């Protein structure tokens, strides 16, 4: 299995859960758990990877005319976060199976959860800045769906709208910062960005680039002073919040 398929697996899992949800609640949980566990087990043999080494970089044609490829990397740091995403995700799958009531749609919950896990996994495995941004925007969308899961509750609808508005606006700032960063470096590949520290810091656009990226990251991760949407997001089901 390549990194491309590893990143794609949770999205396939989201579709699979939706298909088997008609067979019963347990089938949805088993499908979500099996896909998550399979991806986690695939990453397990690389657990010895040092933090300063890159094990694998894979590229697939995406928009070659624009110089953009689907590019994935696996190093010690991305492996750590991928393990956290999948490990905690597996616990959420188990917890939610016994937490949600008979009236709750198990298939919809697990499909949205798999979409969220896939989006986060795509972020930590991305080698391309634009691709990373696409996955990060998918976390905003899937967060909206999860926070508004109990859509009959006003606080859930309000929390979902607030989260989407704040993180969506932050996405525009992040896009601007990434475009400037790509302009400075001449590439959107993270490997090139990491190797161009001196060039970036000495460039006249360094400060606006840094400010835009920080604005995007702070809004999406609910850092002060953009943390106000996070308490409202707790309207999501407890296994998520």
Task: Label each residue range with its predicted role.
Residues 1-241:
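...captures the hydrophobic TM-helix bundle architecture rather than a specific catalytic motif
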């Amino acid at each position: 299995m390549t990194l491309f398929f590893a990143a794609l697996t949770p999205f396939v899992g989201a579709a699979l859960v939706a298909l088997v949800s008609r067979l019963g609640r347990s089938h949805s949980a088993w499908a979500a758990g099996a896909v998550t566990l399979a991806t986690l087990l695939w990453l397990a043999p690389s657990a010895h990877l040092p933090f300063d080494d890159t094990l694998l970089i894979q590229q697939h044609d995406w928009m070659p005319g624009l110089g953009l490829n689907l590019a994935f990397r696996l190093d010690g740091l991305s492996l750590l976060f991928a393990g956290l995403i999948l490990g905690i995700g597996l616990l959420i799958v188990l917890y939610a199976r016994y937490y949600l009531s008979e009236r709750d749609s198990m298939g919809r919950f697990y499909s949205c959860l798999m979409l969220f896990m896939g989006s986060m996994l795509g972020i930590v495995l991305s080698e391309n800045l634009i691709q990373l941004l696409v996955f990060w925007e998918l976390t905003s969308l899937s967060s909206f769906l999860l926070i508004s899961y109990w859509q009959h509750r006003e606080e859930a609808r309000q929390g979902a709208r607030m989260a989407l508005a704040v993180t969506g606006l932050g996405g525009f700032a992040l896009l601007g910062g990434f475009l400037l960063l790509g302009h400075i470096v001449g590439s959107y590949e993270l490997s090139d960005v990491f190797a161009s520290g001196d060039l970036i810091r000495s460039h006249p656009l360094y400060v606006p680039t840094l400010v835009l990226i920080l604005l995007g990251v702070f809004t999406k991760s609910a850092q002060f002073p953009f943390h106000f949407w996070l308490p409202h997001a707790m309207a999501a089901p407890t296994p998520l919040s």
